[in-house]
């Protein structure tokens, strides 16, 4: 809601896209329209849209439509559709293309999307998924309906999650998704 929170969120998320690259490499990526640059531009527009949505008066009147238009335009090019307010800070989009997130979905910190993902309702109800912290969605993974996922869950590639998983630190996969194994953490990262 505040400018400081916006800056902190952007600083945190930018690390994934630009952390160890030299200025020369960053310039080359920008000139050749590298997918990482485009995804970062989209993510930045998403966060500014969220910021201006929470403002009042002239700031909201001018800033919100401007950044929402930019987010939508970049989203059309990249195949990403997300509404403001769905993701807590720490979102990482590894690959663009066919990513759809329902505006009512709520995803906690440090979610990773690997492409071709859907987080949405089931078509029978307007209720959308609620995902905990540190969710890693593999390529093609879908989370559908009024479901809740605990923290530290890895969703395997191609999985369709249509029920809740409330035990943290597990790996799920399959159609419909089921528990594959208990998660193993090593130095704070899943193996």
Name each model-derived stretch.
Residues 1-78, 185-191:
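Terminal amphipathic alpha-helical/low-complexity segments used for targeting or macromolecular assembly
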Residues 81:
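Detector for the N-terminal beta1/A-loop initiation region of ABC nucleotide-binding domains
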């Amino acid at each position: 809601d505040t400018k400081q929170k916006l800056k902190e969120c952007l600083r945190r998320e930018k690390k994934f896209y630009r952390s160890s690259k030299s200025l020369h490499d960053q310039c080359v990526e920008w000139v050749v329209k590298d997918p990482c640059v485009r995804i970062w531009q989209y993510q930045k527009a998403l966060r500014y849209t969220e910021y201006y949505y929470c403002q009042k008066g002239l700031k909201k009147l001018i800033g919100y439509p401007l950044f929402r238009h930019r987010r939508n335009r970049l989203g059309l090019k990249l195949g990403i559709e997300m509404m403001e307010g769905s993701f807590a800070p720490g979102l990482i989009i590894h690959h663009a293309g066919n990513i759809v997130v329902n505006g009512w979905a709520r995803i906690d910190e440090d979610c990773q999307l690997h492409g071709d993902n859907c987080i949405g309702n089931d078509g029978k109800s307007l209720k959308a998924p609620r995902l905990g912290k540190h969710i890693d969605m593999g390529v093609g993974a879908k989370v559908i309906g009024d479901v809740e996922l605990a923290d530290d869950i890895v969703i395997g590639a191609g999985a369709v999650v249509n029920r809740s998983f409330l035990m943290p630190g597990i790996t799920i996969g399959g159609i419909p998704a089921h528990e594959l194994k208990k998660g193993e953490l090593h130095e704070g990262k899943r193996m």
